[in-house]
Design a protein with these regions (language model features):
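Beta-propeller blade signature
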Residues: 80-99, 154-180, 224-259, 315-353, ...
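Structural signature of eukaryotic scaffold interfaces centered on beta-propeller domains
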Residues: 50-65, 115-143, 149-151, 185-219, ...
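Enriched but not universal
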Residues: 1-21, 427-429
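Short glycine/acidic-enriched loop and turn motifs that connect beta-strands
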Residues: 74-79, 149-153, 304-307, 407-411
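Loop/turn-rich, solvent-exposed surfaces of beta-rich toroidal or solenoidal domains
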Residues: 276-384, 391
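Blade-loop segments of beta-propeller domains
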Residues: 56, 80-135
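Beta-strand-rich domains and repeat architectures in extracellular enzymes and scaffolds
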Residues: 35-77
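Blade-level signature of beta-propeller repeat domains, shared across WD40, Kelch, NHL, RCC1
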Residues: 387-429
Length: 429
């Protein structure tokens, strides 16, 4: 496994890379090990005819042992507001898609636009995009975080939907709800900020953070000003959602005035996001989790591969032609066709606790990862259209599952996702 580690700086000076013994995990010293992968049943049903086909993202979470909830897509009616429950099949080593097992669908697709009677709110510009899911084993609930795909007028009203019994998605539901924060400085845009994934916290952090879990939505979305310009985190207690509970404390968020990229580049304007290694126009945090037995909050996604700088012209383009003459339609893309790479950002929960205790002295934009670098995902090699748009941590097995757009080619076309599994050496659950 080839990981490229960047040193990082924070306001108090250089951060020395820590080892597991100090309470922090290091991907540089213990790289993730590629274990193989699996696919999910790609066909749809009446609620989502396209199923896993054409799905440009895949928000997901593990439920009961051997089960996973994953979003799908239907281009005709509501886009990325669909999801279903699947079996996790036996993992097959290697990258031969024809050899991989298919996980059968065990509960049919649900459409949050329909399930929660969003009606005229779910217009084309208001289509709900699932940003994260969380199965709460203590309550049996399935939490679905979502945001409006395009919200140029910042009128998003809802971002959270609760299926009271995850094993019976057709049953009782609570919502639509707005999970927001009073201390994030952007109350009119909180729906976009917090329509994502809920993350369990170790019990020792509950008091310090004022919640039992974290919530984050650091996906790359349209209209950057309504998102965090870097990873984000707020504390929350899921059992209170639906009865007035919201974000207890904003712990990490980056604004346009204080982006994560500013920690390594003082350039002004948008040019910084063309080549910045911490955060740029390609940066995307697909999922996050606390690495068991450590104080490490890990974000995983994709980024621009700065190892290609020696070629020259290693930058990001918008609706342009890449090195192979392919047109990057309607989005940002790397100039080099193999310029996308898996990426991770590791943060110290002790730093976030400083913000929880004194947000004036330690603003939520004051954090930098103590380590970040690359995860080389074999199926992404050389293909600029493949990237990590989804994933989750399997708390039953201690493995990361990365969802790679178009990874199932050539067995399936139409952007069918592949699910790539990585072991974390030394991590036990």
């Amino acid at each position: 496994m080839n990981l490229n580690l960047y040193s990082t700086m924070r306001g108090v000076g250089a951060r020395v890379q820590q080892a597991v013994a100090s309470g922090l995990y290091s991907f540089a010293t213990t790289p993730p090990e590629f274990a193989g992968g699996f696919l999910l049943e790609s066909t749809g049903d009446a609620a989502s005819p396209s199923g896993q086909e054409n799905a440009p993202t895949s928000a997901m979470c593990v439920g009961e042992p051997g089960r996973i909830f994953a979003s799908g897509y239907d281009s005709g009616e509501g886009g990325l507001s669909r999801f279903a429950e699947f079996e996790i099949p036996e993992i097959v080593a290697g990258t031969d898609m024809y050899a991989r097992n298919l996980g059968a669908r065990v509960q049919g697709y649900r459409n949050i636009d329909a399930d929660f009677s969003l009606g005229s709110y779910a217009t084309e510009e208001g289509t709900q995009t699932i940003g994260g899911m969380y199965y709460d084993p203590s309550t049996g609930r399935l939490h679905v975080g979502a945001y409006k795909y395009y919200d140029g007028d910042y009128n998003g009203q809802f971002n959270h939907y609760v299926y009271e019994t995850a094993s019976n998605l057709a049953g009782t539901r609570t919502g639509p709800l707005l999970v927001s924060a009073s201390d994030d400085g952007a109350s009119n845009r909180s729906a976009g900020f917090w329509g994502g994934q809920i993350i369990p916290l170790p019990a020792k952090w509950h008091t310090a953070f004022g919640g039992t879990h974290l919530i984050q939505n650091a996906r790359r979305v349209a209209i950057a000003s309504r998102a965090s310009i870097g990873p984000d985190a707020g504390s929350i207690t899921p059992s209170t959602i639906g009865s007035g509970g919201g974000i207890e404390k904003t712990l990490m968020r980056y604004t346009l005035a204080n982006p994560l990229a500013a920690w390594e580049d003082s350039s002004s304007g948008s040019l910084v996001y063309l080549t910045n290694q911490l955060w740029n126009h390609l940066s995307n945090c697909a999922f996050a989790f606390v690495i068991p037995g450590t104080d490490t909050l890990c974000y995983v996604g994709h980024n621009l591969d700065k190892r290609l700088d020696s070629r020259g012209s290693n930058t990001i383009m918008y609706k342009g032609l890449n090195s192979e003459g392919a047109y990057a339609d309607n989005d940002y893309a790397p100039y080099w066709a193999d310029g996308h790479v898996g990426c991770y950002w590791l943060f110290d929960l002790n730093d976030l606790a400083l913000t929880a205790a004194d947000p004036v002295a330690n603003p939520f934009y004051s954090h930098t990862p103590y380590e970040h670098g690359y995860i080389d995902v074999p199926v992404m090699a050389g293909n600029w259209r493949r990237n990590v748009w989804g994933g989750c941590f399997n708390h039953h097995t201690g493995q990361m599952i990365l969802a790679v757009t178009r990874g199932a080619e050539p067995r399936f076309t139409n952007t069918v996702t592949s699910y790539e599994v990585f072991n974390l050496p030394g991590v036990t659950v």
